[in-house]
Structure formats: structure tokens, C-alpha cells
Regions:
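Short, charged low-complexity linear motifs
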Residues: 1, 12, 20, 36-39, ...
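Short, low-complexity N-terminal intrinsically disordered segments enriched in polar/charged residues
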Residues: 1-29
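A solvent-exposed, acidic/Ser-Thr-rich amphipathic alpha-helical stretch
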Residues: 21-73
Length: 117
């Protein structure tokens, strides 16, 4: 498993647990988290944890996340995924993530592109 797939696996743990420590472990101290590329990012680990928890999916809300790391260029990885939600029958979200990692494999920049089908 490469460093980007390992990061996504840790993201999935945090997504399911909503544990502040799991979330914080994903991001550098001064990370940027873009919930959409055109929105202002959440700035810094503490803000990311707070905003994540304010908007969290409850454990069990999403049923499955299938993904593939489709590109790598140094510290930048591109992840394509599909989220299937358990709460809405047939609710699927297509995801494209830009993940830039530091030397400790924490995200310094995370950008979500998504669309519901």
C-alpha cells in the first residue's frame, strides 16, 4: 500500500469514528482543507477538526467508500472514489480528492471535488 492509499485508509477510520484524535492525525498543523475547490478552506488542524465535527456524517450514515489512487506526483496524490450512503437508498457521491502530504504523511492541503448522482 502506498502512502496515499494509507492516508485514505486513515481518513476512512476518522470518517467512521469522528474521533478528534483520528481527524487531527490526518493533517499538518497549518493544513488547508477545501470542502470544494471554490470555497474558502478550513485553515489549520484545530479548525479542520472543529469544522469536521460540526458537519460530520454519523457512523453508519455511509455504507461504503470505494476508491483508487489514480495519480501520484511527488507529494501530490489524486484519489477517485465513490461513496454510497446507507441513509438514502441509492445515494451515491462521486469524489475526486487532491491530497498533498508532508514528510510525515499528514495532509498539508486537501481538496474535495464531489457530485451526487
Amino acid at each position: 500500500m502506498d502512502r496515499f492509499a494509507a492516508w485514505v485508509e486513515r481518513y476512512l477510520v476518522a470518517w467512521d469514528s469522528n474521533d478528534p484524535d483520528d481527524i487531527a492525525a490526518l493533517f499538518s498543523e497549518d493544513a488547508l482543507y477545501f470542502t470544494l475547490p471554490t470555497r474558502e478552506p478550513w485553515r489549520g488542524r484545530k479548525t479542520i477538526v472543529r469544522e469536521w465535527l460540526d458537519r460530520k456524517d454519523e457512523s453508519g450514515d455511509w455504507w461504503a467508500f470505494k476508491y483508487e489512487v489514480i495519480a501520484r506526483d511527488g507529494d501530490l496524490g489524486i484519489v477517485r472514489g465513490v461513496t454510497e450512503y446507507a441513509t438514502d437508498e441509492g445515494a451515491f457521491v462521486e469524489n475526486l480528492w487532491e491530497v498533498t502530504l508532508d514528510d510525515e504523511d499528514r495532509a498539508i492541503r486537501f481538496v474535495e471535488w464531489w457530485i451526487q448522482r
